[in-house]
């Protein structure tokens, strides 16, 4: 009875706090009380994982991230003693809006959000100046429920633009007026309800595809705008296997774009990089390509040797080139000199090398 009353309090509080977000912020009853055997051994359970996005005509989005987490044991208590959220300061701003702890003994604690901290995020392989907002919760006990909301403004993909500043234009995506997102629908903890809702201007269209799984989707008209909602329930952690592909290629995910065709994003990306000179020739690279393809008779032999050389010699390491990082490739001279880059730069290096071969260039 004690736990039922605590969860009832959570529902009442979230219904009030999330009233304007509608479907994206509703949650189901606590199944850890109804089916405890299903969640035995898990450190924590996400009762709700919800994101609601309001898209502006420029393509910039205002994100409301709502999460309700139940602590199941002492390991879960330790893991959740500090809340963390990653963001890119060059394209977004994020802050905790509200954090409430519903204690197993019936106490309700509203944390002082002015105590939140903003630190440089730990980095490995990619060093683009990512940040983390953090909120210290302190001691938790099994049965406690954490209920918090994060507000974020900006965009998610196409990554970095110009320098940091107070200019609101930094929140507008490089492909101005277009919204694009990839939303993982897999989890690392059991999740009772996961929701992604995006609200766009009436004049915009949105195409979407759900891969490697199923969800419930709907489109409604709300206050002169279109609202797309995607819901998945009773999600269990995705099991990994040795040497399996990345979860983006194996687990449930949602992809969406406001462009008329999927190809429009790629065509825009290609033009940006051709205009920038990402594939411009340099003598030392031409010399290396001539050396590698010497004696190779067929087009596929040339493609194979160049692909292997790029894979072996351009290491994965993301060093920011400043303005344009994230949606503009590092040019060939930079990649060939530094012998490193992220996935887009490695692919760009291979494309540039293929352009040096007359017969392979047509299939670059």
Label each residue range with its predicted role:
Residues 1-23:
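Bacterial Sec-dependent N-terminal signal peptides
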Residues 61, 140, 190, 279, ...:
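Conserved structured core elements
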Residues 22-26, 153-157, 163-165, 178, ...:
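Secretory-pathway-linked proteins and extracytosolic
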Residues 132-136, 289-296, 332-340:
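Second-shell loop/turn segments in exported
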Residues 20-190, 261:
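Lumenal/extracellular ectodomains and adaptor appendage modules
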Residues 356-364:
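Single conserved hydrophobic/aromatic residue that forms the stacking wall/gate
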